[in-house]
Amino acid sequence: SERILRMNQLPYKALHVSGKDHAGYYPGATDMTLKLLFDPNTGKIYGAQGVGKKGVDKRIDILATAIKGNLTVFDLPELEFTYAPPFGSAKDPVNMLGYAALNLIEGLSDNIQWYQLEEELASGKKFLDVRTSGEFQSGRLKVDTIHIPLNELRERLDELDKNQAYIVSCHSGLRSYIAERILKQAGFTVQNLDGAYSLYKMANPKGVEYGN
């Protein structure tokens, strides 16, 4: 756990990835969220957790075997699994954990965890939500928020301040990563809320408000 890693003063990064238990276009796909702890210097995998209705045990078994075999996060994107739409996706959530970990290691992304958000905002950073207007109206974090949908972001960069640091979020993390890349390439200082709205809502339901 993160607590044990901190107690032992081990360098680590945490990340969360959301995905489906099998191909999303095939009927019956259900959501899962996987958490990975790893050494950002060596890629060593410390541990993993998962929640979901189906298929979580399979992914944790894979990651437990990877740890036993001394695989690192650098190996995860290249792992190949049995594929058929009722049983898996062309890119499995385990592969996506690897890609997300490499983005952190290579400096393409910088994340914060849900429990760090309050402190980061108190330090002066601003919160940017890039979900659609419909998603934003349905539910949002109880924090001061700048709302710019991702498909409008490039045209509305002048509404943001390059002297201001931002924390960006979407529903599950993919769009906020894209927004993070757009903003960094434009000269902004940005971090990504790991797991985004879906994880925050699950971990801190009292921190979310619903409706108009």
Protein language model annotation of sequence segments:
Residues 15-16, 127-130:
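Short, conserved beta-strand edge motifs with alternating hydrophobic and charged residues
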Residues 50, 54, 170:
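Conserved residues at beta->alpha junctions
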Residues 74-126, 133-166, 171-212:
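Rhodanese-like catalytic fold shared by cysteine-dependent sulfurtransferases
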Residues 53-73:
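A short, polar/charged loop-to-alpha-helix boundary motif
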Residues 41, 131-133:
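Anionic group-transfer/hydrolysis microenvironments
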Residues 1-46, 50-51, 89, 93-119:
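Mid-to-C-terminal Rossmann-like scaffold of FAD/NAD(P)H-dependent oxidoreductases
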Residues 3-7, 64, 134, 181:
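Surface-exposed charge patches
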